[in-house]
A protein has these predicted regions:
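Positively charged, low-complexity intrinsically disordered leader regions
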Residues: 1-40, 168
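Residue-level signal for inorganic ion chemistry
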Residues: 10, 47, 68, 136, ...
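ATP-dependent carboxylate-amine ligase catalytic core
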Residues: 22, 26-30, 34-37, 63-152, ...
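Nucleotide phosphate-binding/pyrophosphate-handling subdomain across enzymes
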Residues: 37-38, 134-137, 145-158, 162-166, ...
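A conserved segment at the C-terminal end of the G1
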Residues: 44, 52-69
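Extended acidic/charged loop-beta regions that coordinate divalent cations
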Residues: 119-169, 200-233
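C-terminal helical cap/extension that packs against the catalytic core
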Residues: 192, 196-215, 224-226, 297, ...
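A glycine-rich beta-strand to alpha-helix segment
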Residues: 376-406
Length: 408
C-alpha cells in the first residue's frame, strides 16, 4: 500500500471490535515478535493534560540524549503526528510500510483488532525497529482496558488531571473514571499523579493495593515566564494558566526516572521545558488568534481562566461534538466573549452551529452562525480590530484552523 491507501485502510478499521479487551491485540503482537516487550515506557493516562505532559517529558528526554518515541492521539493536521521519534513525525513511506506489514500479519493470523489497537501495534513495531531508548505512551481512552495497557510494565505510570469525559465508556463519576485510569499502574511499579484532590484517596488506595511507589505532584506557582516548583524557578514555553501544574507532574516523572539511573540534568530539564511546543493547547497561531482543543468541562474551565488572564476583549469561534457535555461547556465559556461565532465541521458527530447558537441565544451574548470554520474565523477577526479571537471546543476544529494558518 502507498501512504494514501494506508490512511484509508486505517480509517476503514472499526473503532470497536469483538472480543472486547486486548486478547486479539496480544495475539497480533505475538506474531509481530512482541516488540512492546523490548521497549521501555512512560505510560500516561488522565482526562486533561496528557498530551502536554507527554510532549514536555519527551522533549526533556530527547535533550538528555535518549532516542525518544512519542505516541499520542488524536492528530490535528496529518495522521503522522501520532507517531514521532525525537520530535519528528513518522514519514509517509515508513507509515505505509508498517501499516502494510501489520495488516498482512493481522489478516494472516485472524487477529482482528480495533483501529486504535492497530495503530498501537504499528507504533510498537516502529519504535522497536528504530531502536528507541524510551517511549512516552499516551493512553487513548481510560486506562485499564485501553490498547496501550497491553504493555507488561512501565518505568513510570502517570495519572494526569482527572475529570468527566467519555462517560458513556468510563463511568458517570470522577471516582469511577479514576479507577479506570489507575488501571495502568503495575504491581511493584512507580507512579506519578497530578494532585487530583477530588479522587486522591482512590488513587492512593489503588497504588497501595498494587504495592506501587506513588508520588503526587505538589503545587506549581506561575511566574511571568514559567513557574516555581519546590523553591526552584523553571522556564516554560507552553502557554495557558494550567500548564505550570502539568509541568510539575513532568518534574516528578523525571525525578522518578533519575532514581532509576537516567541522570537527566537540571540543564536538560530547563531546556526541554522552554522548547516544548504542543499544538492547540492555548496556542497562539498569530498575534490575535489563539486555539485550544479543550472539549470537556475541566478543559473549558482551564481555557476560561487563561483567557481572562489576558485582560483583552475576546471573540469566540466554537464548534463541539454531540457526544460531549456541550451545553455545560458552551455556557461556561461564552460569558468571557464580546461575541460568539458558532460553526461546525463536516463530521457525523459534530453539533450543528444552530444548536450552539440556541444555547448562547438565551445568555444575552451576540451570536452569529457560520457553518464554514474559515468564514467563521474571518468574520470573528473582522468583528473587532483589537480583540483576541479564541478558536475552541474541539481538537478537530483546532486542526482545521491550523491548516488555514499553515497555508498562509
Amino acid at each position: 500500500m502507498n501512504y494514501e491507501q494506508s490512511i484509508d485502510y486505517i480509517h476503514s478499521i472499526p473503532k470497536f471490535c469483538r472480543p472486547l479487551g486486548n486478547a486479539n491485540l496480544e495475539k497480533l503482537l505475538t506474531h509481530l515478535g512482541n516488540p512492546q516487550k523490548k521497549l521501555k515506557f512512560i505510560h500516561i493516562a488522565g482526562t486533561n493534560g496528557k498530551g502536554s505532559t507527554a510532549a514536555m517529558t519527551a522533549e526533556i528526554l530527547k535533550k538528555s540524549g535518549f532516542k525518544t518515541g512519542l505516541f499520542t492521539s488524536p492528530y490535528l493536521e496529518v495522521f503522522n503526528e501520532r507517531i514521532r521519534i525525537n520530535g519528528e513525525n513518522i514519514t509517509d513511506n515508513d507509515l505505509a510500510e508498517y501499516v502494510t506489514r501489520v495488516k498482512a500479519i493481522m489478516e494472516k493470523n485472524n487477529a482482528l483488532v480495533s483501529e486504535f489497537a492497530f495503530i498501537t501495534a504499528v507504533s510498537f513495531l516502529y519504535f522497536y525497529e528504530k531502536q528507541c531508548d524510551i517511549v512516552v505512551l499516551e493512553v487513548g481512552m481510560g486506562g485499564k482496558l485501553d490498547a496501550t495497557n497491553v504493555i507488561d510494565s512501565s518505568l513510570v505510570s502517570v495519572i494526569c488531571k482527572i475529570g468527566l469525559d467519555h462517560t458513556q465508556y468510563l463511568g458517570n463519576t470522577v471516582e469511577e473514571i479514576a479507577k479506570e485510569k489507575c488501571g495502568i499502574m503495575r504491581n511493584g511499579g512507580t507512579a506519578v499523579s497530578y494532585p487530583n484532590n477530588d479522587v486522591r484517596d482512590i488513587i492512593e488506595e489503588y497504588a497501595k493495593s498494587k504495592n506501587v511507589s506513588l508520588t503526587f505532584a505538589g503545587t506549581a506557582l506561575p511566574t511571568e515566564n514559567g513557574f516555581i516548583y519546590k523553591s526552584k524557578e523553571y522556564p516554560l514555553s507552553l502557554k495557558g494558566t494550567y500548564q505550570p501544574q502539568n509541568a510539575a507532574v513532568v518534574l516528578e516523572i523525571i525525578s522518578a526516572l533519575n532514581k532509576q539511573g537516567f541522570n537527566v540534568s537540571d540543564k536538560d530539564i530547563s531546556y526541554g521545558l522552554s522548547h516544548t511546543s504542543w499544538a492547540a493547547r492555548f496556542e497562539f497561531v498569530s498575534d490575535r488568534v489563539v486555539i485550544d482543543g479543550g472539549h470537556n468541562i475541566d478543559g473549558i474551565k482551564a481555557l476560561k481562566k487563561s483567557l481572562l488572564s489576558l485582560n483583552r476583549d475576546i471573540v469566540l469561534v466554537i464548534a463541539m461534538m454531540e457526544d460531549k457535555d456541550y451545553k455545560a461547556c458552551i455556557r461556561e465559556i461564552s460569558p468571557v466573549a464580546k461575541a460568539v461565532f458558532a460553526t461546525q465541521l463536516d463530521m457525523p458527530r459534530c453539533l450543528s452551529s444552530e444548536k450552539i447558537s440556541d444555547i448562547i441565544g438565551s445568555m444575552n451574548i451576540p451570536v452569529f452562525v457560520n457553518n464554514n470554520p474559515k468564514d467563521a474565523l474571518q468574520n470573528a477577526l473582522d468583528f473587532s480590530d483589537n480583540s483576541i479571537v479564541c478558536v475552541c471546543g474541539s481538537l478537530y476544529l483546532a486542526g482545521e484552523i491550523k491548516k488555514i494558518f499553515h497555508k498562509k
